[in-house]
UniProtKB/Swiss-Prot annotation:
Enzyme Commission number, as recorded: 6.1.1.23
Name of this chain's protein: Aspartate--tRNA(Asp/Asn) ligase
PROSITE patterns: AA_TRNA_LIGASE_II
GO terms, molecular function: aspartate-tRNA ligase activity; aspartate-tRNA(Asn) ligase activity; ATP binding; nucleic acid binding
Length: 591
């Protein structure tokens, strides 16, 4: 081995020992005839000192520059009093270097690593192999590795088998667009890259592998946001002969163990909340419980008012009127309220009514709002009491279709929590349960809220009679307002699966064409089973405090689903296209 230690492993216990380090020159300093090199590797930094007494080595140190790859041998010693650096793991020691070998020189990098500033993300991604040298980036990938090690260990100890499922499979309707791979040997046919291992892991349950896991690559050709990538990594879990409580207990234990091992944090039991309660109180099926703000229904107090903006929705069973109290918000300037009004407009809200509570003891005179004249004082007092309003607060109102009100005020709640620094703790894990089985579309058709293999809490006959009110056996784990993972008990009887397909408008012919292998499997003794999948990238993002999952993936794609480093996707030559039986209708334009 070329090295004896990593730079970040050096400490006072090695005083007097000879060590050999290999790494990159992070910084070079010449102080009064003594040369200092900060050497960097994946584990951290170490300071190496070269003095003129060893002329040949000193001359070599004088020639090196930033990012040269070097091998250095020297003796560990304590730094002089007052010269320690508490910000470095090796900050109390230094290495007196007496051998230096330049393993490779380096051109000046496209951006400085030791004084990292506002470098554009495209430049960072184009030179990702340079960007990943930065200690903060290396630390994120090290933590990611520790996380997957912890997860594997936990699942192994709990009897799970790591089984790989195919990457080349067939297209199935799972919500997003598939990435397609043309077949050379089957002209005109295409493989699809998996959006998840969902069907294969269910088939593994039918095959008798009752505890499966896989850290799986998944692919979705969808519009990208800060927490999306076209290829992403999933912690995929499936079990047989366990119910919801068992699966949630196992996977909650995995996450609690993960945070304890990796971050030293201990969580108590995760609270459970129904989908209905989450939407009613927080306007979201993934509420951030660090935020103390809550939505409160007030439609019952506004049914008789002459103000149609309120009385209309108050008397419509498909609508909702909710209030959101913001402590201390009465001092909010009009411009800020206008900005929040524009913000809720993104979610379809037509406006944002408000009441500033200046002095409740003065009755209506102590309230500042364009709407108070339209609401009887008795009703106003009930509303203000219900939301807990006190002097100095502001109360916002949403009145519209229930979905619009929940989404708009739910998003406003999150924004206010961050804008006004209202978060009460650092971590708030929870479970959301009892999701609706389906989402009803405007045309009366149904879409599966999770996926079409989720089991309902009723019989096939009850499901087909009342699909709009059916609840599923689904559960989501949420952390700080982010869905960490979602899962469910699956359908394990053929007649139930066919009933769900019928409600989703999937004909028998289409069922057979796209899911025939699954329906076949369900005929041959499929056990009760269920599972859950966590987004690993998202989990790493939360645990490292990164702003985007691109920060925690070694070689991510841009928001336009491209790799600027390798210039992927790229053109292929005509011969390759002919072999794949593909002809382009339009020739791509040169960029």
């Amino acid at each position: 081995m070329m090295r004896s230690h990593y730079c970040g492993q050096l400490n006072e216990s090695l005083e007097g020992q000879e060590v050999t380090l290999c790494g990159w020159v992070h910084r070079r300093r010449d102080h009064g005839g003594v040369i200092f090199l900060d050497i960097r590797d994946r584990e951290g930094l170490a300071q190496v000192v070269f003095d003129p007494d060893r002329a040949e080595t000193f001359a070599a140190a004088d020639r090196v520059r930033s990012e040269y790859v070097v091998k250095i041998t020297g003796k560990v010693r304590l730094r002089p009093a007052g010269a320690g650096n508490a910000n470095m793991a090796s900050g109390m020691i230094e290495v007196l270097g007496y051998e230096l070998e330049v393993l490779n020189e380096a051109e000046t990098p496209p951006f400085p690593l030791n004084e990292y500033s506002d470098v554009g993300e495209e430049t960072r991604l184009r030179y990702r192999f340079i960007d990943l040298r930065r200690p903060e980036m290396a630390e994120k990938l090290r933590l990611r590795s520790r996380m997957t090690t912890s997860i594997r260990r936990y699942l192994d100890e709990n009897g799970f088998l790591d089984v790989e499922t195919p990457i080349l499979t067939r297209a199935t309707p799972e919500g997003a667009r598939d990435y397609l791979v043309p077949s050379r040997t089957h002209a005109g046919s295409f493989f699809a890259l998996p959006q998840s291992p969902q069907l294969f892991k269910q088939l593994l349950m039918v095959a008798g592998f009752d505890r499966y896991y896989q850290i799986a690559k998944c692919f979705r050709d969808e519009d990208l946001r800060a927490d999306r990538q076209p290829e992403f990594t999933q912690i995929d879990i499936e079990t047989s002969f366990l119910d919801e409580k068992d699966i949630m207990g196992l996977t909650e234990g995995m996450i609690r163990n993960l945070f304890k091992e990796v971050l030293g944090l201990e969580f108590g039991e995760f609270p459970h909340m129904t989908f209905e309660e989450a939407m009613r109180r927080y306007g979201s099926d993934k509420p951030d419980l660090r935020n103390p703000l809550e939505l409160v229904d007030v439609a019952d107090q506004l049914k008789e008012v002459e103000f149609k903006v309120f009385s209309g929705p108050a008397n419509d069973p498909k609508c909702r009127i909710a209030a959101l109290r913001v402590p201390g918000g009465a001092s909010m300037p009009r411009k800020q309220i206008d900005d929040y009004t524009k913000f809720v407009g993104i979610y379809g809200a037509k406006g944002l009514a408000y009441i500033k509570v200046n002095e409740r003891a003065k009755g209506v005179e102590g309230l500042q709002s364009p709407i108070v004249k339209n609401i009887p004082e008795a009703n106003l007092n009930v509303i203000l009491d219900r939301v807990g309003a006190v002097d100095g607060d502001i109360v916002f109102f949403g009145a519209d279709k229930a979905k619009i009100v929940s989404e708009a005020l739910g998003a406003l709640r999150i924004k206010l929590g961050h804008d006004l620094n209202l978060l009460t703790c650092e971590w708030a894990p929870m479970w959301v349960v009892d999701f609706p089985m389906f989402e009803e579309n405007d045309d009366g058709s149904f879409t599966a809220l999770h996926h079409p293999f989720t089991a309902p809490k009723c019989s096939p006959e009850e499901l087909e009679a009342n699909p709009a009110t059916a609840l599923s056996r689904a559960y989501d784990m949420v952390l700080n307002g982010t869905e960490l993972g979602g899962g469910s008990i699956r359908i394990h009887r053929k007649e139930m699966q066919q009933a769900v397909f019928r409600l989703l408008g999937i004909s028998e012919a289409e069922q057979e064409e796209k899911f025939g292998f699954l329906l076949d499997a369900l005929k041959y003794g499929a056990p009760p089973h269920g599972g859950l999948a966590f987004g690993l990238d998202r989990l790493v993002m939360l645990m490292t405090g990164a702003q985007s999952i691109r920060e925690v993936i070694a070689f991510p794609k841009t928001q336009s689903a491209a790799c600027v480093m390798t210039q992927a996707p790229g053109l292929v030559d005509a011969k390759a296209l002919r072999e794949l039986h593909i002809r382009l209708r339009e020739q791509p334009k040169a960029e």
